[in-house]
Amino acid sequence: MAEAGTGFLEQLKSCIVWSWTYLWTVWFFIVLFLVYILRVPLKINDNLSTVSMFLNTLTPKFYVALTGTSSLISGLILIFEWWYFRKYGTSFIEQVSVSHLRPLLGGVDNNSSNNSNSSNGDSDSNRQSVSECKVWRNPLNLFRGAEYNRYTWVTGREPLTYYDMNLSAQDHQTFFTCDSDHLRPADAIMQKAWRERNPQARISAAHEALEINEIRSRVEVPLIASSTIWEIKLLPKCATAYILLAEEEATTIAEAEKLFKQALKAGDGCYRRSQQLQHHGSQYEAQHRRDTNVLVYIKRRLAMCARRLGRTREAVKMMRDLMKEFPLLSMFNIHENLLEALLELQAYADVQAVLAKYDDISLPKSATICYTAALLKARAVSDKFSPEAASRRGLSTAEMNAVEAIHRAVEFNPHVPKYLLEMKSLILPPEHILKRGDSEAIAYAFFHLAHWKRVEGALNLLHCTWEGTFRMIPYPLEKGHLFYPYPICTETADRELLPSFHEVSVYPKKELPFFILFTAGLCSFTAMLALLTHQFPELMGVFAKAMIDIFCSAEFRDWNCESIFMRVEDELEIPPAPQSQHFQN
């Protein structure tokens, strides 16, 4: 019985909604008919006469006051709408209309019927949004001592934010520490050093860790009863201490490379020892995992030092060997370093081979992957591309592929073209980036702008085609074309990652809703009319009468501004202006 009653109520509700949706004209005529039938009991004629008499007794000052009051209310609404839009990025009235009024009018029936089916899709989109708003370590990050600090010494500006450096400290604690560090004095010191906020305190702690390893431990071994022999044993070097000094104390890339080579000797020895003991327990396994991260980090930074010092082929070889030795450590994104080095060598065939492996639908994308693929496609046609010729004959297959690759890259990260086309100034890239955000665009363009300039016509092709992407995705926050909708969180995260002197690029740009613009125009227009009517009541009355005559005339289609002013002059009986006299000598 209960189920039957519930079904009947649902059917009744659906019938009512259907009637209001499709039969509103019938309801309207029914209401008019009832009003006509009840016109005598309701005294409609008397009430209309009373209202007409009241309106006839009103003075112009009442209408001026009414107009001023409406202008004031419209201004208050405008101010509130502008404040709400600046704070939340949407119109308050639009949000209320969509969220509360639309369900009452039956605009969400389809969604309610598919509620159970859409729950899984919502959860998937939420997970995707969270993954896209994740902050990643910049695979091409600079050296603090040799590059970031030198920029600070020259300009007096801090290129790194506290939030960015705090994320780096968390990464160092994750990669370079383990639970057994307290058993070794040097590692215990370094565990505290990674938590230090003061750079000088971190450097001092690294030196202290190295000094502890210089102390020799003596082990007394009795060989003869009458004498003893002292066996001298050196403690292993602390690789993480060398890493910290190379990153923060070295003022040149050459000095950093020397320190990383010392770190490689120490880290390689620790890695070999822990590799033999990794199966003896969870503690040894964690230590081996830490030593693996240390060794991979050192080799990657050594390859980057070689790339900075101009030994690009050596850097490519080191990166390839590292990727073969540790193929599962994709967290460091070494393939992006390899792509940049191969582009410097102009080894485009090797670049294409790397892209074929990593530009896969199952792997996370990046600006380096998408824009490098677009660069290779553009390289095939950019030297002969001409917008005029393309508009006459149309795009060829190769040109169409290049344009589609550019559109794909721009959809993934729409901030990059402004930096590649030098429409915005570059800054030093941060140590962490947000994929599809302004921080990733800066990190990519900082290293890859030279590669785009080297390919003849590539920037011209990008300049002619990149804005066409936005016509394909008019609502990027709601629906994408080749990727998921653009995440909303990029602006907030980029403001935390990028320094304050940089103007963060925002996509899509927040435009004022039409309701706010309409309210502003209506408010200004009514306020102006009220002011003119109060100051010049006779002139405004004549002007209004002339406007009514023009709108009601049969020749309204031929009206213009001159006819309006002629009618106003006729009403006011303004004499014509005297004609100028010409004198002859």
From Swiss-Prot:
Keywords: Glycoprotein, Membrane, Phosphoprotein, Transmembrane, Transmembrane helix. It is a multi-pass membrane protein. The keyword Phosphoprotein applies. One of its GO terms (cellular component) is membrane. It holds the Pfam family ST7. The gene is ST7. It is found in: Membrane. CDD domains: ST7. The keyword Phosphoprotein applies. Belongs to the ST7 family. It comes from the Eukaryota. Signal peptide: none annotated. The chain crosses the membrane at residues 15-35, 62-82, 512-532. This is Suppressor of tumorigenicity 7 protein. It comes from Muntiacus reevesi (Reeves' muntjac). Its main location: membrane. Glycans are attached at residue 47. The modification Phosphoserine is found at residue 386.
